[in-house]
Amino acid sequence: MSAWKWVGAAIGLLVLAGFGLTAWGSARWNAAARELIARLDAARTPAAPGTPTRYDARELEGLPAPVQRYFRAVLKDGQPIVTAARVEHTGSFNMSASGEQWKPFTSVQHVVTRRSGFVWDARIAMLPGLPVHVHDAYVAGEGLLHAAIGGLVTMADLRGGGELARGELMRFFAEAAWYPTALLPSQGVRWEAVDDRSARATLTDGAAPLTLLFRFDADGLMESVRAEARGRMVGQVTTMAPWEGRWSDYRVQDGLRVPFTGEVAWLLPEGRKTYWRGTITTLAYEFAP
């Protein structure tokens, strides 16, 4: 066999090995995702006796004016309460903490509203045929962020409570625009007036309450959610920074008016640092009986 044939054979073997590793990594990752989703389902808790299973507009009495307008804009009286959701996205993710390194992603997210939790399973296309797999989750009061090249080579693996869990609960709370019945007072959220276009909402999961600022547009729809401080990883160091999500492209899904497009950013001293832009491609709900 000539030298060139040996080279060609070697390249072919490397390509086959690469495909094999990619398939193995995806299989391992998918197994880990199934385990996380099983834990998410196992942590679900029944509603307390007497908790409404359908939205009743009378519970809006006494809420801040912009919050009342919001619920009237996105819910109809008698709407069943969302207990779980499955959300598929496409979009782009900025892989650089300081620059602009946008890469396309696809993801599937499982959400349960009681006990609050989610599992986000994403694939970010770093190189052709070699995605970065990401799990971002809040399960049973604990946060998780795990990223691995090809599902095999770990880039980040953070798990536990503290600021990590708090940050993941912030994500769940901010994304409640996708499952807005979870923001109702009957579902445990407390609202406080700020002005005619904004209000603070507080959610408690476990021991610590979490408060975010919600802003609404002229039509009553939620346009942004802000936290004054969320933990941001820069290298191996966690720093606190304001954090904001913006919502747009509202559509009606199963009787709920929800945003199908959004972006998330850090609000840094040097300016706004957007790192996630996404669009919902599929949205399916599970409702209270």
Regions found by a protein language model. Name each.
Residues 146-205, 238:
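Flexible, processing/modification-adjacent segments and terminal tails
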Residues 2-35:
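N-terminal type II signal-anchor transmembrane helix
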Residues 68-153:
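N-terminal mature ectodomain segment of secretory-pathway/periplasmic proteins
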Residues 200-287:
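Gly/Pro-enriched, hydrophobic low-complexity segments
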Residues 29-86:
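N-terminal leader/targeting segments and the immediate start of mature chains
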Residues 127, 151-154, 230-232, 266:
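Short, surface-exposed beta-strand-loop junctions and turns on beta-sheet-rich folds
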